[in-house]
């Protein structure tokens, strides 16, 4: 077999070499045929025939010689060195000592001298009777008669040509799409001998070979199976853009062939057929030969003779005249698109009309191959049919030179080559060009070079253009140019053509004639390569040139102006939606694809429906058997129940696979005593151990309708089902979605795309888990099951009803009927939505079915119910609750009806919008008005994982604003409705336990927990980390003003990026560059003195905040797993408007939390604080006491100065601050401030001491009503929001540390200290909350001995703190002395986190000294106050020496231990 393959390869190689040699001689034959006139054609043919005869004679002589040699060999014994014993064949190579003998033991059964008669008989049978050749070698014998040899070896062998392995013509050949017919490039995978069929006409074409492959698709050589005619079929890619391009080509060729060239005399390609095969558009053409580029390539890229070029140009001009009369532009004329009809003749035809368009109705701006691209296309102006004449001039020069005339490797390089040879482009052309400024410079004045050039391109305008240099172009366009190669030694066209080499065989006379021809040829090309399209010759003018007509040349040719075709730019005929080609109807592209998809999908659906029907029949039979068995068992149970005087709770185990299953678990089953009611029917679920794989239908005797349960997963506890809730089933039907593409309804899964059943069931409650209406339905129906699963008897088992009384049964049946009606309505709505073909789902709908099959949180997050048990107990419920629930359900039904009406309105709007978009899209595609190619599959939906099954209607955002507005309105309406329901329900039935809440459910309905809990936890971690990074970056980047607020003030704004601020947009304003530069310079020039150490502000868990209120402000890193219950106004009498004299937050205050009366509720601090001031009124609580730095109207921060009277700390109503913008409160809205996002951030802490420890608190007290410059260091807060038993505990809220200069620079006139009437001893905050509670517990649990020890420890701690305070005061005095020595500018501390210094604010140095003096006085006063408090504490300790057993509460200092 190896020898046979070698022989076949040799034969193939010889044929290829012979064809290559014939291609080399082809050009000479074409030239000879083109030179001879019609009179000499007969003589040339005779000469060729004679030459052929001579060649045949020579071949015959050679064959005779070969035969003689074979005969001689046979006479000598056939083969040299044959050993008949061993059947060994030897052959000698060389001679003498170097002689080598080759032994061949193959085919030893062929013995040459054995039985000549047998060999002759075999030869006669094979038809090899040759008297000259008595024997053939095994290679020749087995090559020619291989099939006969196989037949001899195996009599059962039969050769079938169709079973031969087929060669693949498409690369890559790996199937990927379109049912395995397409590869990764959407090309149809073609094999040799494939049959391509026109399904409409029944015409079949057999694939023979490949002719080429490109970006459009591929061209294959085929044979018509009916007529054996060879054709070329162009198979386009399975993409919509190429389909549209092929459709244009079909229409263009049809109009040219039928109307403008019906006799096929103008060298335009003929269209034979067109159809669709396997979703690919196929166009059948006549079969042609090689193109002109291949002809030049076969000539080793040497130019052709002027005579042959003349023959080609005449035919091309004839074709262009036809195109001009038809107002058609080819747009892609090049040597590759000009093909020879036959190898032996110069007849050509123009092909590839895929880029053709009508004049003045141009489709694309990126047309023509770069080497043949006209100047108007390069610059980006309106083009016409003259661009084809420019391409013809480039083709003419390339045929003569063998290389492209302008071989640019980029558009800039192409323009530079044209400018170098033909001059600068006309100014009129550059003025209209869209890309002119990209490649040219525009200068004022007149260009001196225009006078030297033949073409004056300035036209008397006051400006001129020059080409950009390579450096300028690379700098402006930010690109890098590749190096280009110059192929010609001359720059001008006449020099290049005249200096081209001559043939060596030419005589001097022939050279002179050739020079004259070249001069005429140069003038012809010069007229085609005019830069101005208006001066460029038309095809009619070019055809009258002496080079074409052969007339004598008397100088530069001046064309006839009357033959110049003035382009009328008439509107071309639009491509009709339906056109007929050879009796075959070509439909619109949308209809074609839809029909094909419908046919395929209909076949698949029919098969699926048949299978489903068979399965349903089998299931029904099984269910009937099970139902009969079940009825028998049920009758027996009912008889037992009727005999008993009391209702017994019986266990009915779930039967797995129709076998009884028993267990020792005592799971109660509440059954009815009525035997005739369908409520006693128990559904048998044939389940695997934990999952129900398929839905099972169950039909009762009273109602034959089938009930489909959703796919669920069951826990081990959910094996038992209570009989009271067995027949309360939700009827669900498969939803038929009307697909836009195929238009055929198909069954789809009830789960959303990409979803699977959760581990503990599917959500069926219409309310979210954090809603107060959640899980309040007493009946265990599929609609009232737990939100986290419908598994019966799970940890969150729902409450079931035992309808034992007649009234309860009636109400139960009414409720069941209403539920079924609601579900049916919802199903109908869903069907209507799907039939409309919308790809979007209504996210804001509250229908049950919209949320039936969505995955939610895991079972560990289920909110526990006060009546539920861990073993699936189902206690009875009273009638009062049933009536209330019926009222709630009626309200829900009304809400659902309103929502359904809203949905219908939305659907109608969406349908109208879709129709408009489809009409616009079809008109754009049919008319091809757009400047770019149509998108591929524009209607395909783009899925977003964040929506978990919900799809946006359009990814391009056509109607995003409208949909967003409607969604926001719906969300607001739903939120208002839910709030009303919650308030009503809380008034009627206050909840025992507050439902838990997750951070994801805080921000509205756009976020879902559709994945498993582990996956979502990972996503939450990513989201949290992003929020952390944003928070950290914003703190570093923003420049804050120092505010005198506590570290986490009770009235401080919420932390940025927290759930309370997620819905508020971050406002960004423009910062002038000059002010930014000034700020940067000031920062660089400022010194860096001592900076205080910042403390961490991590929130404390609410469990440890014994005295904190129930409102809690979470940090960005903490998960909110409980609800925020806002206290009502009646529970907080101190927050009434009558008790508060002033608005604490100002006019522009805003809070994300509000109480029932609309007032703002401040967020809760994360550190325990005093609440006393809140009892006395919000007016006494003062913070962020920042004075107005610039009293004049010209403020450096462009802040409007306002005035507002506020009340002091001591309760007096004297006005001490005339500026409403105290400390730049974050709750105020400063529209004129240019600092971005300044007031959305938490202010950093500050105090007046630079090195003062945060834990060393200074006592508060005393009265000082003077306007001093000291800041309050101890701010007392009340705890009126807590119960009355815990309102006596007072905690001091000390200000955090900061440098002296920073605080002074920010305060012009300080506030007054607080008069503290309570027993506060300045207790430090160094101990944590756990230590505080541990100390209280030990105090209560231990005896008097432990109590005394604790008192001693507290005294020791107080002494240590006093010592620390004294040390800190000494350090402060030392530092203050150092700062006094320095200049006022050095006394200012650097801005901490972007704080302003005194120089920036504009505070003079005298005020700083005054502030320092006032602060020293305040320190002395505070020290005296601390000493008084310590004395009071010691007196109280002496009085409270009674044993702790006789006391319930002990007040120690500012603490109350319970």
From Swiss-Prot:
The annotated regions of Low complexity compositional bias extend over 32-76, 446-459, 659-709, 791-800, 808-853, 861-870, 961-988, 1016-1042, 1064-1093, 1246-1255, 1264-1279, 1292-1309
Q: Region (Disordered) spans which residues?
A: 32-83, 441-462, 545-571, 659-714, 791-874, 930-1095, 1128-1161, 1233-1347, 1375-1399, 1435-1458
Subcellular location(s): the record lists: Cytoplasm
Polar residues compositional bias, start-end: 1128-1158, 1233-1245, 1280-1291, 1310-1321, 1331-1344
- Which residues are ATP-binding? 211-219, 234
Which PROSITE patterns does the record associate with it? Answer: PROTEIN_KINASE_ATP (PS00107), PROTEIN_KINASE_DOM (PS50011), PROTEIN_KINASE_ST (PS00108)
Record has Flavoprotein as a keyword: no
List the Gene3D superfamilies.
Phosphorylase Kinase, domain 1, Transferase(Phosphotransferase) domain 1
Any Pfam family from its record, for instance, is Pkinase
Entry keyword annotation includes Transcription regulation:
no
Protein role? General sensor of environmental conditions, such as heat stress, effecting changes through pkaC. Essential for survival to nitrosoative and oxidative stresses. Required for cell cycle control, not only at the onset but also during development (aggregation process and postaggregative development).
Q: What name goes with this protein?
A: Probable serine/threonine-protein kinase yakA
Question: Which species is listed as the source?
Answer: Dictyostelium discoideum (Social amoeba)
The record's gene field reads yakA
């Amino acid at each position: 077999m190896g020898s046979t393959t070698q022989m076949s390869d040799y034969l193939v190689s010889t044929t290829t070499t012979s064809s290559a040699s014939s291609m080399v001689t082809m050009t000479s034959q074409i030239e000879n045929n083109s030179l001879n006139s019609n009179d000499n054609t007969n003589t040339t043919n005779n000469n060729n025939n004679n030459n052929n005869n001579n060649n045949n004679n020579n071949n015959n002589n050679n064959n005779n010689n070969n035969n003689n040699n074979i005969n001689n060999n046979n006479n000598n014994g056939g083969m040299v060195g044959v050993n008949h014993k061993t059947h060994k064949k030897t052959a000698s190579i060389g001679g003498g000592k170097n002689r080598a003998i080759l032994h061949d033991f193959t085919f030893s059964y062929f013995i040459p001298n054995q039985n000549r008669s047998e060999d002759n008989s075999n030869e006669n049978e094979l038809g090899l009777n040759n008297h000259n050749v008595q024997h053939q070698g095994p290679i020749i014998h087995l090559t020619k008669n291989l099939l006969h040899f196989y037949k001899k070896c195996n009599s059962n062998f039969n050769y079938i040509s169709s079973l031969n392995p087929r060669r693949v013509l498409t690369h890559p050949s790996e199937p990927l799409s379109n049912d395995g017919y397409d590869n990764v490039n959407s090309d149809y995978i073609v094999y040799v001998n494939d049959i391509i069929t026109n399904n409409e006409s029944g015409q079949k074409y057999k694939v023979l070979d490949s002719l080429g492959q490109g970006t459009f698709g591929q061209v294959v050589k085929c044979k018509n199976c009916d007529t054996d005619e060879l054709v070329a079929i162009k198979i386009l890619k399975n993409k919509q853009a190429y389909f549209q391009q092929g459709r244009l080509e079909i229409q263009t060729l049809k109009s040219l062939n039928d109307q403008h060239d019906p006799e096929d005399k103008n060298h335009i390609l003929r269209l034979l057929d067109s159809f669709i095969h396997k979703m690919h558009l196929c166009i059948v053409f006549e079969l042609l030969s090689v193109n002109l580029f291949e002809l030049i390539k076969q000539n080793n890229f040497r130019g052709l003779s002027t005579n042959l070029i003349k023959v080609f140009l005449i035919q091309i001009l004839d074709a262009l005249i036809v195109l001009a009369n038809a107002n058609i532009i080819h747009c892609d004329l090049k040597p590759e698109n000009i093909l020879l009809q036959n190898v032996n003749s110069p007849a050509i035809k123009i092909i590839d009309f895929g880029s053709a368009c009508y004049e003045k109705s141009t489709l694309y701006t990126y047309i023509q191959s770069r080497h043949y691209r006209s100047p108007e296309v390069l610059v980006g102006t309106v083009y016409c049919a003259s661009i084809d004449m420019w391409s013809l001039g480039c083709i003419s020069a390339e045929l003569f030179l063998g290389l492209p005339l302008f071989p640019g490797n980029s558009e800039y390089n192409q323009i530079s080559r044209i400018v170098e040879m033909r001059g600068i482009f006309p100014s009129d052309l550059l003025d209209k060009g869209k890309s002119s400024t990209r490649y040219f410079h525009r200068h004022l004045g007149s260009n001196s070079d225009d006078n030297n050039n033949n073409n004056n391109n300035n036209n008397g305008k006051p400006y001129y253009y020059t080409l950009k240099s390579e450096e300028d172009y690379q700098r402006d366009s930010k690109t890098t140019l590749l190096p280009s190669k110059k192929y010609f030694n001359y720059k001008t066209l006449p020099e290049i053509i005249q200096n081209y080499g001559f043939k060596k065989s030419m005589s001097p006379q022939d050279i002179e004639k050739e020079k004259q021809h070249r001069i005429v040829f140069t003038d012809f090309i010069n007229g085609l390569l005019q830069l101005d399209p208006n001066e460029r010759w038309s095809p009619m003018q070019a055809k009258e040139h002496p080079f074409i007509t052969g007339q004598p040349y008397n100088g530069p040719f001046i064309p006839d102006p009357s033959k110049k075709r003035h382009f009328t730019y008439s509107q071309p005929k639009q491509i009709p939606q339906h056109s007929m080609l050879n009796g075959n109807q070509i439909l619109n592209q949308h209809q074609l694809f839809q029909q094909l998809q419908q046919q395929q999908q209909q076949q698949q659906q029919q098969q699926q429906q048949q299978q489903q029907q068979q399965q349903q029949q089998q299931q029904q039979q099984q269910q009937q058997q099970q139902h009969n068995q079940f009825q028998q068992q049920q009758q027996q149970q009912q008889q037992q129940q009727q005999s008993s005087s009391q209702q017994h709770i019986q266990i009915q185990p779930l039967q797995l696979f129709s076998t009884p299953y028993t267990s020792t678990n005592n799971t109660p089953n509440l059954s009815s005593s009525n035997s005739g009611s369908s409520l006693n029917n128990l559904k048998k679920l044939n389940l695997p151990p934990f999952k129900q794989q398929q839905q099972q239908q169950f039909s009762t005797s009273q109602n034959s309708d089938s009930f489909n349960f959703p796919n669920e997963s069951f826990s081990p506890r959910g094996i038992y089902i209570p009989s009271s809730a067995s027949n309360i089933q939700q009827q669900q039907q498969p939803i038929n979605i009307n697909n836009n593409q195929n238009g055929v309804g198909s069954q789809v899964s009830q789960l959303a795309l990409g979803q699977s059943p959760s581990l503990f069931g599917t959500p069926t409650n219409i309310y979210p888990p954090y809603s107060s209406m959640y899980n309040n339905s007493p009946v265990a129906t599929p609609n009232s099951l737990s939100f986290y699963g419908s598994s019966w008897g799970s940890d969150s088992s729902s409450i079931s009803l035992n309808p034992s009384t007649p009234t309860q049964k009636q109400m139960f049946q009414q409720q069941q009927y209403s539920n079924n009606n609601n579900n049916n309505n919802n199903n109908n709505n869903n069907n209507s939505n799907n039939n409309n073909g919308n790809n979007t789902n209504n996210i804001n709908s509250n229908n049950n079915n919209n949320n039936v099959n969505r995955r939610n949180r895991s079972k560990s997050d289920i909110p526990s119910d006060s009546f539920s048990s861990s073993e699936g107990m189902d206690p009875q419920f009273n009638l009062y609750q049933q009536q209330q629930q019926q009222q709630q359900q009626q309200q829900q039904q009304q809400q659902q009806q309103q929502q359904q009406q809203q949905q219908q309105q939305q659907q109608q709007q969406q349908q109208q919008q879709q129709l408009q978009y489809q009409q616009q899209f079809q008109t754009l595609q049919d008319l091809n008005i757009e400047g770019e190619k149509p998108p591929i599959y524009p209607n395909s939906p783009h899925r977003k994982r964040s929506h978990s099954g919900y799809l946006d209607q359009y990814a391009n955002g056509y109607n995003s604003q409208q949909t967003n507005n409607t969604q926001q309105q719906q969300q607001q309406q739903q939120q208002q409705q839910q709030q009303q329901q919650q308030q009503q329900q809380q008034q009627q039935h206050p909840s025992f336990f507050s439902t838990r809440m997750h951070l994801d459910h805080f921000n509205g309905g756009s976020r879902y927990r559709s994945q498993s809990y582990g996956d979502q936890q990972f996503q939450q971690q990513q989201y949290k980390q992003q929020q952390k990074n944003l928070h950290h970056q914003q703190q570093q980047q923003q420049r804050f003003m120092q505010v005198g607020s506590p570290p986490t003030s009770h009235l401080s704004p919420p932390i940025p990026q927290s759930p309370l601020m997620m819905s508020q947009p971050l406002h960004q304003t423009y910062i002038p560059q000059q002010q930014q530069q000034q700020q940067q310079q000031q920062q660089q020039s400022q010194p860096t003195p001592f900076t205080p150490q910042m403390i961490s502000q991590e929130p404390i868990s609410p469990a440890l905040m014994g005295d904190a209120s129930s409102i809690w402000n979470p940090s960005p890193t903490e998960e909110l797993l409980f609800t925020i219950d806002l206290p009502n106004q009646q529970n907080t009498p101190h927050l009434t408007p009558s008790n508060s004299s002033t608005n604490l937050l100002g006019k522009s205050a805003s809070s994300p939390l509000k109480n029932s009366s609309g007032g703002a509720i401040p967020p809760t601090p994360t550190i325990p604080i005093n609440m006393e001031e809140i009892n006395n009124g919000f007016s006494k609580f003062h913070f962020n006491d920042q004075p107005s730095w610039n009293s004049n109207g010209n403020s450096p921060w462009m802040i409007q100065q306002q005035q507002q009277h506020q009340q002091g700390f001591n309760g007096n109503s004297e006005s001490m601050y005339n500026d409403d913008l105290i400390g730049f409160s974050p709750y105020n809205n400063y529209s004129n401030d240019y600092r971005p996002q300044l007031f959305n951030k938490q202010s950093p802490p500050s105090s007046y001491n630079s090195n003062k420890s945060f834990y060393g608190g200074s006592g508060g007290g005393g009265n000082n009503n003077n306007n001093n410059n000291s800041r309050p260091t101890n701010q007392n807060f009340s705890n009126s929001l807590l119960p009355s038993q815990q309102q006596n505990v007072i905690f001091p809220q000390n200000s955090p540390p900061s440098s002296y200069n920073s605080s002074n620079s920010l305060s012009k006139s300080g506030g007054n200290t607080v008069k503290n009437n309570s027993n506060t001893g300045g207790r430090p905050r160094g101990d944590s909350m756990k230590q505080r509670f541990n100390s209280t517990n030990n105090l209560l649990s231990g005896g008097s001995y432990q109590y005394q020890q604790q008192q001693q420890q507290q005294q020791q701690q107080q002494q240590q703190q006093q010592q620390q305070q004294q040390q800190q005061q000494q350090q402060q005095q030392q530092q203050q002395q150092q700062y006094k020595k320095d200049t006022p500018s050095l006394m200012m501390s650097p801005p901490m986190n972007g704080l302003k210094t005194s120089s920036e604010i504009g505070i003079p140095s005298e005020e700083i000294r005054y502030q320092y003096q006032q602060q020293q006085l305040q320190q002395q006063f505070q020290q005296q106050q601390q000493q008084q408090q310590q004395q009071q504490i010691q007196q109280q300790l002496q009085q409270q020496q009674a044993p702790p057993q006789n006391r319930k509460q002990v007040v120690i200092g500012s603490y109350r231990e319970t």
